[in-house]
Amino acid sequence: VECDYLNQIIGKEKLSGYTANIAFTGFTAPKILWVKNKEPENFARIRKIMLPKDYIAYQLSGVHCTDVSDASGMLLLDVKHRKWSPEMLEICGVTEEQMAKVYESYETVGNVLPEIAKELDIPETVRIVAGAGDNAAAAVGTGTVGDGRCNISLGTSGTIFISSEKFGVDRNNALHAFAHADGHYHLMGCMLSAASCNKWWMEEIVGTGDYAAEQKDIEKLGENHVFFLPYLMGERSPHNNPNARGTFIGMTMDTSRTDMTQAVLEGVA
C-alpha cells in the first residue's frame, strides 16, 4: 500500500528526481510510512532511523552514522548529491535530525568507546568506519570500481552490478541507481530469488538435498522445453512486483523431475 502511494500518488517521476529510484517493498521509506499509518504511537517515539550495520557502528562508537551506498537503498537519499533528500523526508514525516549523518564508506566516524574497548580487550584507538552495503562492499572486493566494470553475484538473491564514474538513472527505473565508492555510482539489477530457488527445489520438493547427484543427471539432458519463472519472493528487477509468483511452464506427461531441476537452474540463469 505504501509503495503504491509513493509510486502512484507521489509519482515515479518525482521519486526518481528526488532519489534516483522508485519505491520497492524492501526500501526504508515505505516502511516508515507503514509505521506512521499503522502504529502512530511508535512513529511518534522515533528518535533516530538507522540501518542494522549502522546501529552496530553506533553501539561501538556512539556516533549515529550511515554510508552513501547503504543509505541509497532507503529511498531517502538524494543519490546524485549524496545527502538526505528534504522532499522525501517531508513526505515520510521525519526530520534530518532523526537521520544518521551520511559518510563515504571509507570515512572514519569515530573511535571505539572506552567501555567497549575494555570489554572487548582492544585498544581505544581502534577506528570505526562507515562501511558499505553488501553488494557495494563485494564490488570493491572484486575490483568493480572503475567506470563500466560489472559483476554478477548469485546468492539468496542475484544481482548485476555496474560501476560508473558518472551519475545516471535507468529511464525505466528497472535498475537501482546507488552511490558507490570513490565518489562513483552504480546501477544494480536485483533478482530476489536466485540460488534460493535451487535450495527450495532440492530441499523442499525433491527432498534429498543431494545437489551433486542431481547435477550429474542434468548433464545427460539436452534442450529443455520446461521453463521456470523464479519469482518465489516477488520480484524487483526488471519487474517491480512484490506479488509476482513462480511458475513452471511447458510441462507434459513426459516431464521428469530432472527436467524440472534443469528448468529451475536455467530460470535463474
Residue ranges with predicted function:
Residues 4-64, 75-86, 90-93, 114-269:
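Active-site core segments that coordinate phosphate-bearing ligands/cofactors
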Residues 97-103, 127-129:
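General small-molecule cofactor/ligand-binding pocket signal
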Residues 67-71:
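Nucleotide/phosphate-binding loop and acidic/charged catalytic motifs
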Residues 1:
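A charged helix-plus-loop insertion that forms the helical arch/lid used to bind
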Residues 100-108, 215-218:
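Short linear loop/turn motifs
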